[in-house]
Amino acid sequence: MVIGAQWGDEGKGKIVDYLAAKADVVVRSQGGNNAGHTVVTGGKAYPLRLMPSGIMYPDTVCIVGTGVVIDLKSLLEEMNTLKAQGVDPSNLQISTRAHVVFPYHIRLDEAEEARKGNRKIGTTKNGIGPCYADKINRIGIRICDLMDKDVFAEKLKYNVEVKNMLLERLYGVEGFDYEQMLKDYLGYAEQLRPYVCDTNHTVHKYIEEGKNVLFEGAQASMLDLDNGTYPYVTSSHPVAGGACVGAAIGPHLMQNIFGVVKAYSTRVGEGPFPTELNNEIGNTIREIAHEYGTVTGRPRRVGWLDARAVRYAAGLSSFDYLAITRLDVLDGMDEIKICVGYEKDGQPVEEYPADLKYLEQLTPVYRTFKGWKQNISGIRKYEELPENARAYVEAISELTGVPIGIVSVGPSREQTIVVKEVF
């Protein structure tokens, strides 16, 4: 399993793509098209949003699981783009139980974010939150509903009526035409019908057959709905437990859980970010690493690595190994810092606080490391990394209490140093 250990954009797609070479099945378990990830292979970048990263491998079954919320139009566009790039998506399976994102979800998302003004969350405005809200309210529409025209028509009619009332009366924006939406989505349903199946059944079948199954998380631990920096979080549970629920498997089947950690920290949108660098160092890292959102294009906030936050994330998902990414971005720096904990009024704070006002009053405690002046992007063996780079990586392991499994030194599949083989 691959889980983001920070605030997202850690490079999960690259790690999943690498591990998928030896996987028979890759399962996406939560989130929606708000989760952008990029796979680089053969010098070509493939930005993905709903597709599991294993789609690059023609013999790997790729499953969009029960916990995912699916924008059908976005998924079809992504499939067509991949086809145009020579990638065959015929190995895709879509869960009958997954919920569908509709245009009214997107418009509600946009309208509510605008209404919040200065209190905005920083949502991607892809309708993810409103779709999950319908799921919780038990009025959501699932993929299996779309496969039955009469069932779908009845459920859609109810939802369009309710959502139009909200949009027009509360937000003062235009609603939607039910007949047109029905026609559009029945068309999408027919295009996707060949890929739809009971993935709860197929996942267990593959496991029972002894297949190598890789579970791919979206977003990241610090954006978890319950345990992240609420309300500046996502609408699902991007932790190991959430993956179990979203993929419909029990926790004892999860082995080799990788926490993906960028060698520095980034965050998109609003919310607390204790180690943020609003200075030349932060700007330099952003430009070297091109830290702009895959989905939104927004510049990411940049900071030093927060080992306290990663240790908290490790506790949420019981990481077996860390996958350190973008270590090469730090090439040439004189000094590099890691946040090892927090203080308030000179006293150490042991927990990661829920109270965001309190969190913002904390002072990060840093440990400073010597940088390295060598270009490490061509290194393939851990022992060949510069001494200072190894010292930095090993400090991350020590401070988080999790051993190193993978070190990534570049965006491509080949730029990967494997410390621990899992397949």
What are these regions (language model features)?
Residues 1-423:
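Non-transmembrane, aqueous-exposed alpha-helical and coiled segments at domain scale
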